[in-house]
Design a protein with these regions (language model features):
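Mobile, glycine/GP-rich and aromatic-enriched active-site lid/loop segments adjacent to catalytic centers
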Residues: 1-140, 219-340
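A conserved FAD-binding loop/helix module that cradles the flavin
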Residues: 133-155
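Alpha-helix termini
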Residues: 143-144, 161, 302
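Long, amphipathic alpha-helical stalk/connector segments used for oligomerization, subunit docking
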Residues: 161-256
Length: 340
């Protein structure tokens, strides 16, 4: 506890304990030789009702986990299954600390968080909902449905307010985008004749190979599971170089059908998201969420300089992310104080 307090200060005393600190404790326990860590299911599953509810939850939210148990002869009624922590590299999963910057509601958001239509991003006419704007446990199921309705209503208002002032589509730009989008199909059609078998081609890169390459880069150079979530500036600088090389190769993606075309464009988007994650992780010179990631060169939380949001804007021409800070207003806390 003392070592965590030295790292994050008073946050260690918050109740409930922040998710990242629970993950941190998990990692330290395993590093100290205290593994494996297990989920206690045997006691609960003795109750038939709790067993039914438990399986409804497992099969409803983590069906892959149930399949892993079945494949390893694990019955959670008889064995407490092992747990392994592996958060995605966009910070925090359920407790994510990331999302697009969007305008808040008129009746609640501070001026700096509100510039127009509810849930509209900084791109005019582009609206977001759910995990797009930052994931929390409140955005499961009904939460994401509700936020979708809010964004949808705001988008309708935006369209109605345009009236006859509608944007015009450049036909030449539209045709150029069509060629670009379907290019992986053409790359495969031409390149497949250069090989007699297998998946390795001198002319095209399959989406799966590109995805595996991306995962390796992010794991090794952006604080992934294989590195125990540890990262520093030199690692990320090299990671950015490797991502740029991967982006160059994406022009040669090949797709043998529409499903692989979907995978090809998913890979484009994942690489862009990965670049963004790398840029934000490098810009924030502190360890804000130990248990999700650790900056080896800035191992402590630094509220004096980094109690803020970090915002990025992507420059399509230069391919660079421009970073800036934005203030954090504790809206709920302030309203609680006002009510008291």
């Amino acid at each position: 506890r003392d070592s965590i307090e030295q790292m994050v200060g008073d946050y260690v005393n918050h109740e409930p304990v922040p998710t990242c600190l629970r993950n941190h404790a998990f990692l330290k326990e395993v590093e100290a030789g205290g593994g494996p860590i297990r989920m206690v299911t045997k006691e609960a599953f003795k109750d038939p009702h709790k067993e039914i509810v438990g399986w409804e939850n497992f099969l409803g939210m983590t069906i892959g986990q149930a399949v892993v148990w079945a494949a390893n002869n694990i019955d959670p009624k008889e064995i407490n299954p092992e747990l392994v922590m592996s958060e995605p590299y966009v910070m925090g999963s359920h407790a994510t600390c990331s999302g697009a910057w969007a305008s808040g509601p008129e009746d609640y958001a501070p001026d700096e968080y509100q510039w127009g239509y509810n849930r509209m991003m900084t791109v005019d006419g582009l609206f977001g909902a759910g995990d797009t704007l930052g994931g929390t446990p409140h955005k499961f199921s009904s939460g994401s449905f509700t936020e979708g309705r809010l964004a949808g209503k705001a988008a309708v208002k935006y369209v109605n307010d345009l009236g006859t002032n509608v944007p015009e589509v450049d036909e030449a730009e539209y045709m150029a985008l069509q060629v670009e989008i379907y290019q992986p199909l053409e790359n495969y059609r031409v390149g497949r004749n250069e090989i007699t078998g297998g998946t390795v081609s001198p002319s095209y890169l399959l989406p799966l190979a590109g995805l595996q390459r991306l995962e390796k880069i992010m794991d090794e150079y952006c604080g992934g599971c294989g590195q125990r979530y540890m990262v520093n500036t030199p690692l990320m600088e090299r990671g950015i170089e490797l991502l740029k090389m991967l982006k160059e190769d994406l022009a040669n993606l090949g797709a043998d059908g529409l499903h692989q075309l979907l995978r090809a464009w998913e890979l484009h988007h994942r690489v862009l998201a990965s670049e963004c994650v790398m840029a934000h992780t490098m810009y924030r010179e502190e360890t804000r969420w130990p248990g999700y990631y650790y900056r080896g060169d800035f191992p402590k939380l630094d509220d004096k300089n980094w109690h803020c949001f970090t915002l990025s804007q992507y420059d399509e021409r230069s391919g660079e992310f421009h970073m800036e800070k934005a203030p954090v207003y504790h809206i709920v806390d302030e309203h609680k104080k006002a009510a008291e």
